């Protein structure tokens, strides 16, 4: 005989209280007498009752669910951010809906609309710039949004990040200090604010401070693929460039392998500094010098900020900038 599911009605009947009282106990409402609360909890334990999250949401107008929009679930950069998000979500009793967007604007919009339809309490957005449709979708909803580990083209959205402009400036300055007059910037799309505004500006800041004239021919914009920069590596070195600051680790490994496979030694003939310090930087040889971002902390702080927004507390910052560093490895000299 099939075992009947234990419902809130079952608990109320066994405890001889109303379903409203059981609901208040389950949702942590303080307006229940201690003796009554304990009686309900004892029945819940004895019957092994598992409250239905959707039903609880209908009662409290909250679903205790957060949507996380991630561009590429296999990318270690976003995976580390997600780990920090998940740990804090668990601490505050929130469930996570993880949605992969594949860097596709149409899919991102569909994903966000789906999360809104599921009535999530908040959204953490990992990715780059917002399309006009997505911006309108965010603004038309009362659901709070936090941007994690990036810069987008909507400064009104709360964000947790490092100072990407300052970090880029420090990386390029280090390469310039190694007597390189021709330092390239290798980047994915400059259409993304994080690259076209912050990192490009940091690159130009370092050049200006060192008295080196900016040459737009040294800004190598790619489609973000490993293959494209791998194929361009030899031509870049042959053009007289002796060092490059690269905006993500995937591209940096492509550049490194392209140089190495063409007999160009790193760091003897060419130096590289990358940006994210994911596992990619330590799995290649030589290992890559990189800007180090506290990715786990960025994810964790993003989730904590979102909890404050969802609870509408006053003690919150809308733009949180965490510290970064540069980790020296084998792709640069003078470690």
Language-model features and meaning:
Residues 1-7, 61-173, 177, 232-239:
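Alpha-helical recognition/docking segments in bacterial nutrient-uptake
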Residues 1-64, 333:
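N-terminal helix-turn-helix DNA-binding module of bacterial transcription factors
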Residues 1-2, 46, 87-92, 140-147, ...:
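Bacterial carbohydrate/catabolite-sensing allosteric modules
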Residues 10, 16, 21, 30, ...:
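Conserved functional loop/turn residues at catalytic and ligand-binding sites
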Residues 14, 19-24, 58-74, 174, ...:
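Short beta-strand segments enriched in small/hydrophobic residues
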